[in-house]
């Protein structure tokens, strides 16, 4: 049986960026062997990077300087269901995924935006859907 491939989103353009890095390290380090995690880091500036390196480098933020990082996006095309890696020479590859596990904290991570993107792409998400995330995050509604 093929391993399930889970995209783990971490970091983010929020004040809780550092907390998300520690959560990502814990989650990725504890992934069962039957899961193939894909680490997708989001910088403080909001840049999405495919990160194939050591999980140890996530904790201190040095993952962003890894020369093997490359830009990536979640494909909004429901027929692709994957992460598109954008290689420096303009080429791209799609890595199919079975689900998304956002370990983002705060704005842009727990407020329904990422959850809505996953819904648009037809990807299952681990955690709240976009409506529940938006309602629970915005305490002024």
Name each region found by the language model:
Residues 1-141:
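ATP-binding N-terminal substructure of ATP-dependent carboxylate-amine bond-forming enzymes
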């Amino acid at each position: 049986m093929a391993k399930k491939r889970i995209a783990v989103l971490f970091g983010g353009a929020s004040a809780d960026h550092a907390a998300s890095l520690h959560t990502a390290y814990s989650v990725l380090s504890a992934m069962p062997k039957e899961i193939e995690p894909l680490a997708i880091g989001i910088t403080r500036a909001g840049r999405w990077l495919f990160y194939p390196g050591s999980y140890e480098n996530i904790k201190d933020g040095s993952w962003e300087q890894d020369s093997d990082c490359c830009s990536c996006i979640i494909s909004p095309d429901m027929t692709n269901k994957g992460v598109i890696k954008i290689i420096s020479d303009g080429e791209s590859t799609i890595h199919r995924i079975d689900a998304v596990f956002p370990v983002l904290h705060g704005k842009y991570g727990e407020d329904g935006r990422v959850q809505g993107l996953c819904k648009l792409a037809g990807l299952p998400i681990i955690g709240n859907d976009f409506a529940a995330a938006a309602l629970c995050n915005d305490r002024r509604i």
